[in-house]
Amino acid sequence: MNYTDLKDKNLNELQVLLKEKKVLLFELKAKLKTMQLTNTSELRATKKDIAKIQTALTAVKAN
């Protein structure tokens, strides 16, 4: 996910996307705790996606 993809979205789309990513992060953390997660780099990528979405949300709210 690139920031350039996110800056074209409106506020509602970004909020929905943020909620989906947070749910995914929760599921990944649960899988990690139960030793079901084999690719731990997914956690890092999901956290970075959440940060990008939050940055885009801040930019949209500022305008």
Swiss-Prot record:
Pfam families in alphabetical order: Ribosomal_L29 (PF00831)
Coiled-coil residues are: none
The keyword Ribosomal protein appears for this protein? yes
Q: Which UniProt keywords apply?
A: Ribonucleoprotein, Ribosomal protein
Q: Which family does it belong to?
A: Belongs to the universal ribosomal protein uL29 family.
The organism named in the record is Aliarcobacter butzleri (strain RM4018) (Arcobacter butzleri)
An example Gene Ontology molecular-function term: structural constituent of ribosome
Ligase recorded as keyword:
no
Designated name of the protein: Large ribosomal subunit protein uL29
Show the GO cellular component annotation of the record. ribonucleoprotein complex; ribosome
Superkingdom in the source lineage: Bacteria
Q: What are the annotated disulfide bridges?
A: none
Please give the InterPro entries that the UniProt record associates with this protein.
Ribosomal_uL29, Ribosomal_uL29_CS, Ribosomal_uL29_sf
Entry's Gene Ontology BP terms: translation
